[in-house]
Amino acid sequence: MAAGRILVVAPNDELRRSLAFALEAEGYEVTARRELPYHGWVAEKAFDGTVLDQRALTGTEYESIAFCVKAHPVVLLAIRPHSWLVEWVSDIVEMPVIGNAVTSALDRAIVPAG
């Protein structure tokens, strides 16, 4: 069973709740947000990983990249990922999400300490 503190950012209520439920069932401790939180808050919380719906990125490219750097490792959920964002995320899961694609991507992205 997985373990770790995960931030989920998705503007769609159903998707956000579904992701939180699935990740909690896998053993993750989940904090879910509708919008991107401030970078300082993300750094302070020191999450083990982030699941990010690309539709939550409403700012500039620079702001989106800065968030991905602070929230690393990031698993991006997208129908068509922004080409400028691809190198700043750990993994990409195509939408619609099928099966355990998100948990598998998180398992690959999160490197155990030690």
Model-found features: residue ranges?
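CheY-like receiver
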Residues: 41-42, 105
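Phosphate-coordination loops involved in phosphoryl transfer and adenosine-cofactor binding
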Residues: 2-5
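Conserved acidic carboxylate
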Residues: 10
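A structural preference for short, hydrophobic beta-strand core positions in alpha/beta folds
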Residues: 32-34, 76
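Local beta-strand N-terminus motif with an aromatic residue
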Residues: 47-48, 89
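Two-component/phosphorelay signaling modules centered on CheY-like receiver
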Residues: 13-31
